[in-house]
Amino acid sequence: MNRLTRSIGAVGVSLLFAGSLAGCGGSSDSAGTASAGPMDASKANLPKTEADVNGTIDKSKVKKSLVVGVDNPYYLFHHDIEVALSKGYFKEFGIDTVEIKTIEDPLPPLIGGSLDLALYDTDTAIAAARKGDQNLRFLSVYLGGEANVLGVGKGINSGADLRGKTITGGQFGSRNDAIIRQLLRDNGVEPDRDVKIVSTGGQSNERLQAVITGTVDGASIQLRHRTVLEKAGGKVLFEETREVPQSGWSATKLLQESPETVTAFLAATLKARQFITDQANKEEVLTIMRAKKFDIPTEYADAYAAENAPAYHVSDGGFKPADMEKFIGDQIAYKTVPEGTDWRQYTYLLPLWRAQKALGLPLNPALADM
């Protein structure tokens, strides 16, 4: 995912946001009311300089209990919250409890109001905002790297061996489906001519098992699956990695009712992420997550350095605008995002900038880059 840059003057026009949100420059949260409607961007107190960003979180305005949705049961998508709870980071910013609900698609309950925030695919959230919920906003990147990996079963050692075989990238129309097709083309294999592409549900763990059991001959899998697949007699045939702001946090009702809470949530989880991406803390993080009953076999633990690298599990929650521009452009081409979508219109970065400033981190994206 990649991006183009625009002048700071464009921020006031393109970063539209729902509700009367707290201004960057002051500590006031008085406009964050549930009754507020979409705000005229000309009235928005958006930051023009870093000095305008208020890094002080008023805990008296923070909601004490939150319910958030995550689409993946793998520990990587839960450990920011569990570590923040374990180490007291949420309480530091005024939040007492956070309940995580694992839901295959957390956007409907987020839009319906039963979730406060959702961790989900960036493009899907932006597309949902464009198509329906005008108050939904993408807030911060969670995973900023993408590994496009084709795992195959026994006896497949080259692109030529794939001819006539069955491959899945997950559900038709998903990003995984699109990028596995591109990976095949990049390696001289034409989808739907040289191989049979099938649609399957579930996450990457289910696709791995489908390869191991022979249900399919190859599938889009994750880096952590390499050792497991090799022990079963398979292998990674093709792979590529790139910077892509593929998933992150979004909010709608909470952003209108209590923008201070959104900032507090991001500050606590980013503080946890700073701890997690410090490789010296690997064993403590894994101990916390195993105590929470997450299944982390040795093969998955061995992938910790790759999956929790600061550029992959983005340590500051930010992104390069050019990467986002490229990503959303690709998704428009894949028809998963409506034609003409301007991602800036459905992205609201003030809570992220405030959280970064609260933690003493540089603002990312930089104001000048937006």
Where are each of the predicted segments found?
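Secondary-structure end/capping motifs
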Residues: S258-G340
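Conserved C-terminal helix/tail region of periplasmic/extracytoplasmic solute-binding proteins
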Residues: S42, G329-M370
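Bacterial lipoprotein signal-peptidase II cleavage site
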Residues: L21-A36
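Extracytoplasmic/secreted envelope proteins and their assembly/folding machinery
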Residues: H78, E82, L107, T122-A125, ...
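Pocket-lining segment of extracytoplasmic ligand-binding domains
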Residues: I197, Q203-F294
